[in-house]
From Swiss-Prot:
Component of a PRC1-like complex. Homodimer. Interacts with cbx2. Residues 285-304 have a biased composition (Polar residues). Keywords: Chromatin regulator, Metal-binding, Nucleus, Repressor, Transcription, Transcription regulation, Zinc, Zinc-finger. Pfam families: RAWUL, zf-C3HC4_2. One of its GO terms (cellular component) is PcG protein complex. Residues 262-281 have a biased composition (Low complexity). One of its GO terms (biological process) is negative regulation of transcription by RNA polymerase II. InterPro entries: RAWUL, Znf_RING, Znf_RING/FYVE/PHD, Znf_RING_CS. Its main location: nucleus. This is Polycomb complex protein BMI-1-A. It comes from Danio rerio. Residues 234-320 are annotated as: Disordered.
Length: 320
């Protein structure tokens, strides 16, 4: 999966701010010769005394530099959507200006120039805005069979309507659905727009921007519930071979270090301890732990008539 990283608005500031005034673009305007952008008022005032770009010194025009600048609506929309509250504050400043200066003729300007455009008309969504949404169960079989009048009535009855802040994420909505419907943790919930699953880090504002929600109704969301996939533990064959080789080498070293008088522990009949732990080497003269307790088998495989002799510290000892 691709890892998604969030970046801060300060990292984008060099692309969103005017070098002439040091603020965010307002009425972004671009020079067509070099594609550098500025605020409209800033670049118009600058070109009154200069014919060169303030960033790269490219000549804008020999005699009339204002002919080679263009309004950049796309860049301005990006700035308004990325910077919280910028559009609302700018519209308020314009309304206040024309209220304090009624003599200024603004009849020829647009509604945006006069500050009479609301966030809804501009499709600008703020973090603290309340968004209405509808949530319903996603039934792929019903979509394949087609919608009848009865199914449409059922869908209307199964819809639930919520009012949530625009900054709420899909993860919060999933947690709300799980707690509301008592869905056990063995099932996973997917929130969807139409038939496309949504990422957990998407906010309602992101969904509205990505899928161009027009505010002509509640934001339509769906959800589905399905069992969680269990993760299977995969053992690599290489590890098994290494373990087998390791056990063989251990058993070989044990045989090499054993005294000559001690009989071999290998036997054609399996002992109970070997049935319990088949992967470990078994020694009949050593008590084996079973279920955390040490047990000594009374009936050993090998019955010694005499006590064996073993070399201890280079000397032979025997007990009668």
């Amino acid at each position: 999966m691709h890892r998604t990283t969030r970046i801060k608005i300060t990292e984008l500031n060099p692309h969103l701010m005017c070098v002439l005034c040091g603020g965010y673009f307002i009425d972004a305007t671009t020079i067509i010769e070099c594609l550098h952008s500025f605020c409209k008022m800033c670049i118009v005032r600058y070109l009154e005394t200069s014919k060169y770009c303030p960033i790269c010194d490219v000549q804008v025009h020999k005699t009339k530099p204002l002919l080679n600048i263009r309004s950049d609506k796309t860049l301005q929309d990006i700035v308004y959507k990325l910077v919280p509250g910028l559009f609302k504050n700018e519209m308020k400043r314009r309304r206040d200006f024309y209220a304090e200066h009624p003599s200024v003729d603004a009849a020829n300007g647009s509604n945006e120039d006069r500050g009479e455009v609301a966030d809804e008309d501009k499709r600008i969504i703020t973090d603290d805005e309340i968004i209405s949404l509808s949530i319903e169960f996603f039934d792929h079989r019903a979509q394949q069979q087609g919608c009848t009048e009865e199914r449409q009535k059922e869908e209307v009855n199964n819809k639930r309507y919520l009012q949530c802040p625009a900054a709420m994420t899909v993860m919060h909505l999933r947690k709300f659905l799980r707690s509301k419907m008592d869905i056990p943790p063995t099932y996973q919930i997917e929130v969807m727009y139409e038939d496309e699953p949504l990422k957990d880090y998407y906010t309602l504002m992101d969904i509205a921007y990505i899928y161009t929600w027009r505010r002509n109704g509640p934001l339509p969301l769906k959800y589905r519930v399905r069992p969680s996939c269990k993760k299977m533990k995969i053992t690599h064959p290489q590890e098994g071979l290494n373990n087998a080789n390791r056990s063989e080498s251990d058993s070989a070293s044990d045989k090499a270090c054993s005294p000559a008088g001690v009989p071999s522990t290998s036997s054609p009949l399996p002992s109970p301890s070997t049935l319990v732990q088949p992967s470990q080497p078994h020694f009949t003269h050593i008590s084996s732990p079973i279920n955390g307790t040490t047990m000594t088998s009374p009936n050993r495989q090998f019955n010694f008539s005499k006590v064996r002799k073993s070399a201890l510290n280079g000397s032979s000892t025997s007990s009668g």
